[in-house]
């Protein structure tokens, strides 16, 4: 169900990150090297989740793996125990909570009209649902973390803190961001561009759906303009 996916991606997954932040406070900050295996696993997990996104044909599964990949960066940033790392982790958790929940809403909006979640069968929706295409574009750009979004702020802080801790991590982070951009653009092009494959009449978008998307993206944009509210 869509409500369960939204709550799981936006709240419950982030509660795990919050729990790690609280637990890390009881460990000495000078023993970061002890957590090196966990940092490597977190970054490697982010890469694997991103690569898994590239081979997904199910729209909902793609968004779910996207949430997992972002949490890999969050865990790595928390474990190194630096102020920038914690600030970046908090920023990315909040921003991606809004973004992933909005993506699940859009996936459900598409499913209600096409009755399928297969990417290749949902193409061409920009011809019939142009306003929904606008929401898809904005949400995917947020997922890619374009400036000046909160996602960009969080990823920039995480990249800076991890690079300062170990310069080699910039290779993994750069690869992760490249794959994220690839599957986000693939998701947008697969669902919106191309000829429409549906022969039946498509129901137009409703005001409640636009309101739901507005309630996701407007708070995210407001926080992006004033990030000191959360970090």
From Swiss-Prot:
Broad class of the protein's primary localization: mitochondrion
Species this chain originates from: Crotalus lepidus
Short name of any one Pfam family annotated for the protein: Proton_antipo_M
Keywords linked to the UniProt accession: Electron transport, Membrane, Mitochondrion, NAD, Respiratory chain, Translocase, Transmembrane, Transmembrane helix, Transport, Ubiquinone
GO CC annotation terms, alphabetical: mitochondrial membrane
Keyword Transport: yes
EC number(s) per entry: 7.1.1.2
Listed PANTHER family: NADH-UBIQUINONE OXIDOREDUCTASE CHAIN 4
Subcellular location field: Mitochondrion membrane
Biological process annotations from GO: ATP synthesis coupled electron transport; electron transport coupled proton transport
Database matches in InterPro entries: NADH_UbQ_OxRdtase, ND/Mrp_TM
Gene name of this polypeptide: MT-ND4
Protein name: NADH-ubiquinone oxidoreductase chain 4
């Amino acid at each position: 169900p869509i409500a369960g996916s939204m709550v799981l991606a936006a709240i419950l997954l982030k509660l795990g990150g919050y729990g790690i932040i609280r637990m890390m406070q009881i460990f000495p900050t000078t023993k970061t090297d002890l957590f090196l295996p966990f940092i490597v696993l977190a970054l490697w997990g982010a890469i694997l989740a991103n690569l898994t996104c590239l081979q997904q044909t199910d729209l909902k599964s793609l968004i779910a793996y996207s949430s997992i990949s972002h949490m890999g960066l969050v865990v790595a940033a928390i474990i190194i125990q630096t102020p920038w790392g914690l600030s970046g982790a908090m920023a990315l958790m909040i921003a991606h909570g809004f973004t992933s929940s909005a993506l699940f809403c859009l996936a459900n909006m598409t499913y209600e009209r096409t009755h399928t979640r297969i990417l290749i069968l949902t193409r061409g929706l920009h011809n019939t649902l142009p306003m929904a295409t606008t929401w898809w574009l904005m949400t995917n750009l947020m997922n890619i973390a374009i400036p000046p979004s909160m996602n960009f702020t969080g990823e920039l802080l995480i990249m800076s803190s991890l690079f300062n801790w170990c310069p080699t991590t910039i290779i993994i982070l750069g690869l992760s961001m490249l794959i994220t951009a690839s599957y986000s653009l693939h998701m947008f092009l697969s669902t919106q561009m191309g000829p429409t494959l549906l022969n039946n009449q498509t129901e137009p978008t409703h005001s409640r759906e636009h309101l739901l998307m507005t309630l996701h993206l407007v708070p995210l944009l407001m926080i992006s303009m004033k990030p000191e509210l959360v970090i």
